Regions:
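Non-catalytic, mostly N-terminal accessory regions of nucleic-acid modification and defense proteins
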Residues: 1-220, 289-301, 306, 420-423, ...
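Surface-exposed acidic, glycine/proline-enriched linker/cap segments
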Residues: 280, 336-356, 366
Length: 792
């Protein structure tokens, strides 16, 4: 198995051009460009199948006649045997015979009979394509016959079998599964280039797949024994990755004198790509393997896993990245009802550790799905090669799904290596991509280690772009990467080794105390009139109705409600100058807010707050309290004196209205606990302080100021841990700060680019001096012109 040559790539490009021209010539006035695929893709599959079945057509018809004559009910196995394939067609037609058929409705009937003659496994493929829905349109446009004729052109071979001349020499090469996938991807790109569909779905080039397969198999090549191996791809597309992986494993086994039986398993949500994958497995004679490929719009790997109880030896995939999985999330119960045990695990001291990413990008969910299918009891365990984009390395804060997944992977020591690929290596995207290699049976020298390889500059350019793909990995490039991967664990400019804990950090929350001054001045108290929210609207309503809101609210409510709905009963065509200036402008307030504004209890509650604040003002005066703690104590005493007991929310509203932040004020105490006489207390960095009052000692905790709240990332390998970092980096700048220990979380991120950053070399002094002299010469010339001009 070799990486496709430039000549092979050109040949595939020529085939894609040929098929595109058929589509553009025949379907331009029948379908919009984005719908060409509904006809062209199933036609490609039909032509491939038709070519394979052509040689045994007569034998199949004879066998069918014999079985019918003898009333044999179960005919599938016998007909497959007659066809020499995992599928067959029992109609009297071939595409060549249909080409000679009449046009119009007769051709339609014959073509439908031809489709109906295929075996049940092919019928499912045609159903996924929804191809029968297109036939009448093609007949009405008089293009069905022309399409059949075009796809039978002797200058192109769409078959997985080579076309040979009379002497047995290959005239036209075969179009294998991966070649078909390349053509398919190019056609999809062209079909959708105007509306930019499927931006997150990228067919994986054969050179990348070959590298992935080698990275997956080569470390265990010597351990492969004769026996059965299961390969799995949870986003299998057209099946190219599974095919290359199967070929690689088979070759390795043969090289080591082993006999292996390989079974392929795949799942694909896109009906078209699933149909092509299944069709190509049938074309390869792998009918049993085709039965292990499941797909369709209702077969999402995330929400409808079809292999939940299976474990696999090797897993390979290029899942969609940057693509929403919200539909899957909803099917799985949404954020509140999510309970899939694949993504909620016991890890560390958390029995419900969540491996659930944000709904905008589910690529790491595919990785979790694979990790849950690793073999636990076999000596070889399981190995995984998967492609991700850069966001999988660092997206997600500590405690969020993406970071949790990285933490779960690294703390279980499953990640072996990450390899950065060249830009523009894929057909439909130029973004940075990375191969992750994982295993649950690491070699000793890899345990608790992760290898990063920067192969982004190792490639050879293509003569002609294939979509956005402008380069490829040559055989030498692939071997260079594999050699580096298999080599000794030592750092080079392109290879770095890390401990798994190097990527971990504590995210700590740094708090500082709230410092307030307070004053019961009339203007501050008046703001409590609108303390229940929507201050601007409440102010407008108050401005119109005043104290009537407290005594006549039921009477005023219909009028206020109409105004809030934007319906004042006025004529919209009334001149602006005739409007009553006392009438507030029309509003259209959402129902939830409107409901609260129309609740008389909120207005009465705010009125009560004003009354309580004025009562406190009578006792405390309107002077400034420099210490909010003193203010609260005096306020409570005033309320107690008048027999008024306030709820915590009421106090909070009043304090908020009459207080403001001031750095010079003492910290606001949240909790004050008296210590026993012999009780030992050592203040730390967690926000608990010692306060002494005479002979009494108190443990004091302060209210945090949310405006001053900050976070810091502390490496897990920080010497001295969090405390040492905090004393060195935080306390010198904020002596009153503390750590909210309950909020500390562990996160993991892999800053790949930072590890391989190469700063631009500084220019030498001679270069700088030469530039300065050159600028001086230019400046002198310009100055001479200016001075000379003035003199003139």
């Amino acid at each position: 198995m070799s990486t496709p040559s430039t000549r092979d790539q050109s040949h595939l490009k020529w085939i894609a051009d040929f098929i595109w021209n058929i589509a553009d010539d025949r379907l331009r006035d029948v379908y919009v460009r984005g719908k060409y695929r509904d006809v062209i893709l199933p036609f490609i599959v039909l032509r491939r199948m038709d070519a394979v079945l052509e040689g045994t057509k007569q034998k199949v018809l004879e066998r069918k006649q014999f079985l019918d004559k003898n009333n044999v009910a179960e005919q599938d196995g016998a007909l497959r045997m007659a066809a020499g394939q995992a599928f067959y067609n029992v109609s009297e037609f071939t595409l060549a015979k249909l080409k000679a058929s009449s046009q119009g409705q007769r051709l339609r009937e014959d073509f439908i009979a031809y489709l109906d003659g295929f075996s049940p496994n092919v019928q499912e493929i045609l159903t996924k394509f929804k191809f029968r829905d297109q036939i009448q349109t093609l007949v009405d446009a008089h293009v069905l016959g022309y399409l059949i004729e075009d796809f039978l052109d002797p200058e192109v071979n769409l078959s997985p079998l080579p076309v040979k001349d009379a002497d047995g020499r290959i005239k036209l090469p075969a179009l294998d599964n991966h070649g078909m996938g390349t053509v398919f991807e190019e056609l999809i790109r062209r079909f959708n280039e105007e509306n930019n569909e499927e931006a997150g779905e990228h067919f994986t080039p054969r050179d990348v797949v070959k590298l992935m397969a080698k990275l997956m198999f080569m470390p265990v090549a010597e351990q492969i024994q004769s026996g059965t191996y299961l390969l799995y791809d949870g986003a299998c597309g057209t099946g190219g990755m599974l095919t290359v992986a199967e070929e690689t494993l088979q070759e390795l086994a043969e090289e080591h004198g082993k006999e292996v039986s390989i079974h392929l398993f795949g799942q694909e949500i896109n009906p078209e790509t699933y149909a092509i994958c299944k069709a190509d497995l049938l074309l390869k004679g792998e009918g049993d393997e085709a039965e292990h490929i499941v797909g369709g719009a209702d077969k999402s790997t995330l929400s409808a896993d079809q292999f939940r109880s299976r474990e696999f030896d090797f897993m390979i995939s290029n899942p969609p990245y940057g693509k929403s999985w919200k539909t899957d999330l909803d099917r799985m119960g949404g954020k509140k009802g999510f309970a899939d045990p694949r993504f909620i695990v016991s890890h560390g001291d958390d029995p419900e550790f969540k491996l659930i990413t944000r709904s905008s990008d589910g690529q790491l969910m595919f990785l979790v799905n694979k990790l849950q299918k690793m073999k636990q009891r076999s000596p070889l365990g399981s190995r995984i090669a998967i492609v991700h984009n850069g966001s999988a390395l660092f997206t997600g804060d500590a405690g969020q799904g993406e970071s949790n997944i990285r933490r779960w992977v690294l703390e279980n020591d499953w990640l072996e290596a990450i390899i950065a690929l060249p830009l523009n290596i894929f057909y439909n995207t130029g973004i940075a991509t990375y191969i992750w290699v994982l295993a649950n049976r690491k070699a000793d020298h890899r345990k608790s280690k992760v290898q990063l390889i920067d192969a982004s500059s190792w490639f050879q350019p293509l003569r002609r772009n294939l979509g956005k793909k402008n380069c490829e990995l040559s055989e030498a490039d692939i071997q260079r990467i594999v050699d580096l991967y298999l080599g000794q664990p030592q750092d080079t400019p392109e290879c770095k080794w890390f401990d798994t804990s190097d990527f971990g950090y504590w995210k700590i929350t740094v708090e500082r105390p709230l410092r307030l001054k307070s004053q019961l001045k009339r203007s501050a108290i008046e703001t409590l009139r609108f303390a229940s929210g929507d201050e601007a609207l409440r102010a407008e309503i108050w401005g119109k109705y005043g104290d009537k809101l407290y005594s006549e609210f039921p009477k005023l409510k219909p009028e206020i409600e109409a105004w809030l709905k934007g319906d004042t009963g006025e004529d919209d065509d009334e001149p602006e100058g005739d409007e009553d200036e006392s009438t507030p402008a029309k509003k259209a307030v959402p129902e939830k807010r409107r409901k609260k504004l129309l609740d008389s209890a909120t207005w009465q509650r705010d009125k009560t707050l004003i009354e309580l604040a004025l009562l406190a003002q009578q006792e405390l005066g309107d002077g400034v309290f420099d210490d909010h703690n003193d203010f609260r104590a005096r306020f409570d005493a005033a309320m107690a004196k008048h027999g008024r007991k306030l709820a915590a929310a009421e106090k909070k509203a009043i304090y908020k209205a009459v207080s403001w932040r001031d750095e010079a004020a003492p910290p606001v105490i949240a909790k004050r606990t008296k210590l026993k006489k012999d009780e030992h207390f050592e203040p730390g960095l967690d926000g608990a302080y010692l306060q002494e009052a005479g002979k009494d000692r108190f443990m004091v905790e302060y209210e945090p100021d949310t405006d001053l709240r900050d976070t810091e990332q502390v490496p897990l390998k920080e010497p001295g841990g969090i405390d040492a970092f905090f004393r060195r980096e935080v306390l010198p700048h904020a002596p009153d700060a503390w750590i909210a220990t309950d909020a500390t979380k562990v996160g993991y991120e892999i800053s790949f680019a930072r590890y391989f950053y190469k700063p631009a070399p500084l220019r030498s002094l001679d270069q700088i001096r030469a530039d300065i002299l050159k600028l001086e010469q230019q400046t002198e010339g310009l100055l001479q012109k200016i001075v000379g001009g003035v003199s003139a």
